[in-house]
């Protein structure tokens, strides 16, 4: 095993594992195996209202039925509050974050329109100079201006990516108004603490990557290599998800779903990879992955 490679799969326990999630799990697993590395699972259960009781255990059981067992015990984000608090305190001490009293409506009104390509509203910096009499609701990370705001990185699938944090995103939230930790802070702290060297995930998270790289720099932690795979969409062109009615995987017959996932990843035509046993499928799929993304020499 190559201790220099550490990858992970990070599902949210909002329901059972479905085909869209399987594609992400398979891609991250194949990349780890092709590199002879360690594959981890992190349960991203910070969003309490959306977390379904028992879903995390169900996801782990499904992964096991599909032949994907993490090399170390899974980590739950809900147990990581102290680590997130320590990271925020470091940023506060460095003067890189500030409290924000703006509501989403106030931000929308000040902008008149949100940038369509982002899941959060771009922030105009209203509270950068103070709360102006409003109560603190959230904590935001101050992004730089000018050329320093442009974050460029090479994605192993999507190639060179660039984003201007100042004009396209604005100062972004690290701790939400409801007291919950924002995804960007949690994932950066978790990846750093786990020693993650390679992140393989869906392209729906591509827009988050520049923010995460900037936050990594602020915290002085390494930046992993990134690979964003195409997401699975439904008949309406929407991302396949639990919210759009994605159904649970059939545990008792994993090979058809695995072959379809490999086909989605461009590794083979649907059904071309060997059936019969999981071992035969994974051996062929890992070789096919390594031919594109390396190295698996010998």
From Swiss-Prot:
Annotated motif 'HIGH' region, positions: 11-21
Q: What is this protein called?
A: Glutamyl-Q tRNA(Asp) synthetase
Question: Which prosthetic group or cofactor does it need?
Answer: Zn(2+)
Gene name for this UniProt entry: gluQ
Give the lineage: Bacteria, Pseudomonadati, Pseudomonadota, Betaproteobacteria, Burkholderiales
GO CC annotations?
Answer: cytosol
Q: Which InterPro entries match?
A: Glu-Q_tRNA(Asp)_Synthase (IPR022380), Glu/Gln-tRNA-synth (IPR000924), Glu/Gln-tRNA-synth_Ib_cat-dom (IPR020058), GluQ/Sye (IPR049940), Rossmann-like_a/b/a_fold (IPR014729)
Organism for this UniProt entry = Burkholderia cenocepacia (strain HI2424)
Binding-site residues for Zn(2+), renumbered to this chain? 100, 102, 123, 127
Motif annotated as 'KMSKS' region, chain positions: 239-243
Answer yes or no on keyword Nucleotide-binding.
Answer: yes
Query: What protein family is recorded?
Result: Belongs to the class-I aminoacyl-tRNA synthetase family. GluQ subfamily.
Q: Describe how the cofactor binds.
A: Binds 1 zinc ion per subunit.
Q: Please name every pair of cysteines joined by a disulfide bond in this record.
A: none
Q: Which GO terms describe its biological process?
A: glutamyl-tRNA aminoacylation; tRNA modification
Q: Which residues bind L-glutamate?
A: 8-12, 44, 183, 201
Q: EC number(s)? A: 6.1.1.-
The entry marks the following residues as binding ATP, namely 242
MF term (GO), any = zinc ion binding
């Amino acid at each position: 095993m190559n201790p220099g490679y550490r990858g992970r799969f990070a599902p949210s326990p909002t329901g059972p594992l479905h085909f869209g999630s399987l594609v992400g799990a398979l891609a991250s697993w194949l990349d780890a195996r092709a590199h002879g590395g360690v594959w981890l699972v992190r349960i991203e259960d910070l969003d309490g209202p959306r977390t379904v009781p028992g879903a995390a255990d169900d996801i782990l059981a499904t992964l096991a039925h599909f032949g994907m067992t993490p090399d170390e015990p899974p980590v739950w984000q809900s147990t990581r509050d102290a680590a997130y608090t320590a990271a925020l305190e470091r940023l506060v001490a460095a003067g890189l974050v500030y409290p924000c009293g703006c509501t989403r409506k106030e931000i929308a009104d000040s902008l008149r329109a949100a940038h369509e390509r982002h899941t959060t509203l771009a922030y105009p910096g209203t509270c950068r100079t103070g709360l102006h009499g409003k109560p603190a609701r959230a904590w935001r990370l101050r992004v730089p201006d000018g050329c320093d705001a442009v974050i460029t990185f090479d994605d192993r699938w999507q190639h060179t990516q660039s984003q201007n944090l100042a004009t396209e995103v604005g100062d972004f939230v690290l701790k939400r108004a409801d007291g919950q930790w924002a995804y960007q802070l949690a994932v950066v702290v978790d990846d750093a603490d786990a020693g993650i060297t390679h992140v393989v995930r869906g392209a729906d998270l591509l827009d988050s990557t520049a923010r995460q790289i900037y936050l990594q720099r602020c915290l002085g932690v390494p930046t992993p290599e990134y690979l964003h795979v195409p997401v699975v969409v439904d008949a309406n062109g929407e991302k396949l998800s639990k919210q759009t009615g994605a159904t649970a995987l059939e545990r008792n017959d994993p090979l058809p779903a695995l072959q379809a996932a490999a086909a989605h990843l461009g590794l083979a035509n649907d059904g071309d990879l060997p059936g019969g046993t999981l071992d035969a499928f994974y051996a062929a799929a890992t070789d096919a992955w390594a031919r594109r993304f390396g190295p698996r020499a010998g």
